[in-house]
Amino acid sequence: MWKVWLLFDPRRTLVALFTFLFVLALLIHFILLSTDRFNWMQGAPTAPAQTS
């Protein structure tokens, strides 16, 4: 396993990994925000009150 770090620079590899994970997290959150069920910013749509 230690020979892998001889091929790749650890600093650049970790920066690339964390950048990829951050972009992936943003993408997942924006996809969830675009749905009605998981949009926590606007809240669930409320049903109109029924009077009888």
Curated annotation (Swiss-Prot):
SUPFAM superfamilies (alphabetical): Light-harvesting complex subunits
UniProt subcellular location: Cell inner membrane
Domain of life from the UniProt record: Bacteria
Membrane topology field: Single-pass type II membrane protein
InterPro entries to which the protein is assigned, alphabetical: Antenna_a/b, Antenna_alpha, Antenna_alpha_CS, Light-harvesting_complex
Keywords for this protein: Antenna complex, Bacteriochlorophyll, Cell inner membrane, Cell membrane, Chlorophyll, Chromophore, Light-harvesting polypeptide, Magnesium, Membrane, Metal-binding, Transmembrane, Transmembrane helix
Cytoplasmic side: 1-12
Listed Pfam families: LHC
Periplasmic topological intervals: 34-52
Residues the record lists as binding a bacteriochlorophyll: H29
GO molecular function ontology, one term from the record: electron transporter, transferring electrons within the cyclic electron transport pathway of photosynthesis activity
GO cellular component: organelle inner membrane; plasma membrane; plasma membrane light-harvesting complex
Protein's GO biological process: photosynthesis, light reaction
TM annotation in the entry: 13-33
Function: Antenna complexes are light-harvesting systems, which transfer the excitation energy to the reaction centers.
Sequence similarity: Belongs to the antenna complex alpha subunit family.
Subunit details: The core complex is formed by different alpha and beta chains, binding bacteriochlorophyll molecules, and arranged most probably in tetrameric structures disposed around the reaction center. The non-pigmented gamma chains may constitute additional components.
Designated name of the protein: Light-harvesting protein B-880 alpha chain
